[in-house]
């Protein structure tokens, strides 16, 4: 991936907003992913999900972690080793969900940045989200 392009763009991302929306959209668009978040309270409608404080907080946490990955693009596997262990061994999250969240993140970035999120930038971010998803799924292999 083009590190300079990615890190330069990422510095403009409002992690709390984008993270909250990305996780919220994942739970709405792919409702079966909600089973990992049943303890978050009301997830019965799109408005409930997107307004849920626990969803917002976890979305920020997810994107803070992704930000850390953006700073360590050469070692995604090492960067996400502990999170991979947690999500795979303890939470038993289907690794496909990591790919889905990555794709939702790209949609949210496009929504927030419009024309600034060029096809070239999208291509770079698809590589990054694929790399992060692969690193998170590492414990399954």
Swiss-Prot record:
Pfam families: Globin. PROSITE patterns: GLOBIN. Red blood cells. GO terms for biological process: hydrogen peroxide catabolic process. InterPro entries: Globin (IPR000971), Globin-like_sf (IPR009050), Globin/Proto (IPR012292), Hemoglobin_b (IPR002337), Hemoglobin_oxygen_transport (IPR050056). GO terms for cellular component: blood microparticle; haptoglobin-hemoglobin complex; hemoglobin complex. Keywords: Heme, Iron, Metal-binding, Oxygen transport, Transport. Residues 1-141 form the Globin domain. Heme b binds at residues 58, 87. Heterotetramer of two alpha chains and two beta chains. Belongs to the globin family. Involved in oxygen transport from the lung to the various peripheral tissues. This type of beta-C chain is found when anemia has been experimentally produced. This is Hemoglobin subunit beta-C. It comes from Ovis aries musimon. The gene is HBBC.
């Amino acid at each position: 991936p083009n590190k300079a392009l990615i890190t330069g763009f990422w510095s403009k991302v409002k992690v709390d907003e984008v993270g909250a929306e990305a996780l919220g959209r994942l739970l709405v668009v792919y409702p079966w992913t909600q089973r990992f978040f049943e303890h978050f309270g009301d997830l019965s409608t799109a408005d409930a999900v997107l307004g849920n404080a626990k969803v917002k907080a976890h979305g920020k946490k997810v994107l803070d972690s992704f930000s850390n990955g953006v700073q360590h693009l050469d070692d995604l596997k090492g960067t996400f080793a502990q999170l991979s262990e947690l999500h795979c061994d303890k939470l038993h999250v289907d690794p496909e969900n990591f790919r889905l969240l990555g794709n939702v993140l790209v949609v949210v970035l496009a929504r927030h940045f419009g024309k600034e999120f060029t096809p070239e930038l999208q291509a770079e971010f698809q590589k990054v989200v694929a790399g992060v998803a692969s690193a998170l799924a590492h414990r399954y292999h």
